[in-house]
Swiss-Prot record:
<dbReference type="InterPro" id="IPR001658">
    <property type="entry name" value="GphnRH_fam_rcpt"/>
</dbReference>
<keyword id="KW-1015">Disulfide bond</keyword>
<dbReference type="GO" id="GO:0005886">
    <property type="term" value="C:plasma membrane"/>
</dbReference>
<keyword id="KW-0297">G-protein coupled receptor</keyword>
<feature type="topological domain" description="Extracellular">
    <location>
        <begin position="182"/>
        <end position="208"/>
    </location>
</feature>
<dbReference type="InterPro" id="IPR000276">
    <property type="entry name" value="GPCR_Rhodpsn"/>
</dbReference>
<feature type="transmembrane region" description="Helical; Name=1">
    <location>
        <begin position="39"/>
        <end position="59"/>
    </location>
</feature>
<dbReference type="GO" id="GO:0042277">
    <property type="term" value="F:peptide binding"/>
</dbReference>
<feature type="topological domain" description="Extracellular">
    <location>
        <begin position="1"/>
        <end position="38"/>
    </location>
</feature>
<feature type="disulfide bond">
    <location>
        <begin position="114"/>
        <end position="196"/>
    </location>
</feature>
<feature type="glycosylation site" description="N-linked (GlcNAc...) asparagine">
    <location>
        <position position="18"/>
    </location>
</feature>
<feature type="topological domain" description="Cytoplasmic">
    <location>
        <position position="328"/>
    </location>
</feature>
<feature type="topological domain" description="Extracellular">
    <location>
        <begin position="106"/>
        <end position="115"/>
    </location>
</feature>
<feature type="transmembrane region" description="Helical; Name=6">
    <location>
        <begin position="272"/>
        <end position="292"/>
    </location>
</feature>
<keyword id="KW-0812">Transmembrane</keyword>
<feature type="transmembrane region" description="Helical; Name=3">
    <location>
        <begin position="116"/>
        <end position="136"/>
    </location>
</feature>
<keyword id="KW-0675">Receptor</keyword>
Length: 328
């Protein structure tokens, strides 16, 4: 979801972007009590997520060192490593940025960092969502269409590379649409407020609506649908297999039983999807509501607003707990 100072595009104001515009009607935003609570919770979750994800990366590194010479980590652990890196990136960029921005209320870092950090913020949100898609696809194919080990390795590398690449490309527009605006009391008077926003970056209001909706589809709807379809296929296939005669039970070269390790990773994949839904749904429901009814911010309690946004920060905290429990 993108920030903006107004729901309308004023041509006079738009011509003054990057210089200054008259102060809009109404009080400027300040750090309220609920805002302070949000900042406190944000930095607490930042410490939790950083500790958990960094610890899991360290554990994977030690696991790699214990491997016999010439042997590599399993495909699943490689995918978990990519997901952990993506979660760590989101933690180190999005959470401190959100916390500091809520403290300062306005933007003091200049236009260059406004663009760069806005790009990195969206990039670090795309990456973990796409990595969870890769894991869901990988587990689904491992159950329904098992391939030789070498083919699986190549497919895994292609999918993870595509996930990182798409994250980078889809976040690209942030470098263009985010700008600094400076508000002042009147012409020639002292500047009183600066902000990093998308104000006036779109010729028509529906252009911004389209961009926001496109981002919502790519960040939430598409990953969610893919994960749901993959998990449904996994559950359906396992149900069929478990209903067969135990003497004929065979899954991907395993005899007479489903390997426990594979069952663990399948349960983990389902848990990832559940975590994604629980953590991100409130965030995007609030975003969609705002896009169609900007006035809702004035009707909704500020603490409730902050609470919904904080839900999204739980996802990188839950993920290492999930894969730590199921994989090692």
């Amino acid at each position: 979801m993108q920030d903006d100072t107004s729901s309308e595009q004023n041509p006079t104001h738009c011509s003054a972007i990057n210089s200054s515009v008259p102060l809009v009607q109404g009080a400027l935003p300040t750090l309220t009590l609920s805002g302070k609570i949000r900042v406190t919770v944000t930095f607490f979750l930042f410490l939790v997520s950083t500790t958990l994800n960094a610890s899991f990366l360290l554990k994977l590194q030690k696991w790699t060192q214990k491997k016999e010479k010439g042997k590599k980590l399993s495909r699943m652990k490689v995918l978990l490593k990519h997901l952990t890196l993506a979660n760590l990136l989101e933690t180190l960029i999005v959470m401190p940025l959100d916390g500091m921005w809520n403290i300062t209320v306005q933007w003091y870092a200049g236009e260059l960092l406004c663009k760069i950090l806005s790009y990195l913020k969206l990039f670090s949100m795309y990456a973990p969502a796409f990595m969870m898609v890769v894991i869901s696809l990988d587990r689904s194919m491992a159950i329904t269409r098992p391939l030789p080990v070498q083919s699986n390795r190549k497919l895994e590398q292609s999918m993870t590379g595509l996930a990182w690449g798409l994250s980078s490309v889809l976040a690209g527009p942030q470098l263009y649409i985010f700008k600094m605006i400076h508000l002042e009391n009147g012409p020639g008077q002292t500047e009183v407020f600066s902000q990093c926003v998308t104000h006036c970056s779109f010729p028509q209001w529906w252009h911004q609506a389209f961009y926001n909706f496109f981002t919502f589809i790519c960040l939430f709807i598409i990953p969610l649908l893919i994960m749901l379809i993959c998990n449904a296929k996994i559950i359906f296939t396992l149900t069929q297999v478990l209903q067969q005669d135990s003497n004929k039970l065979q899954l991907n070269q395993s005899k007479n039983n489903i390997p426990r390790a594979r069952l663990r990773t399948l349960k983990m994949t389902v848990a990832f999807a559940a975590s994604f839904i629980v953590c991100w749904t409130p965030y995007y429901v609030l975003g969609l509501w705002y896009w169609f009814d900007p006035g809702m911010l004035h009707r909704m309690s500020e603490p409730v607003n902050h609470f919904f946004f904080l839900f999204a920060f739980l996802n990188p905290c839950f993920d290492p707990l999930i894969y730590g429990y199921f994989s090692l």
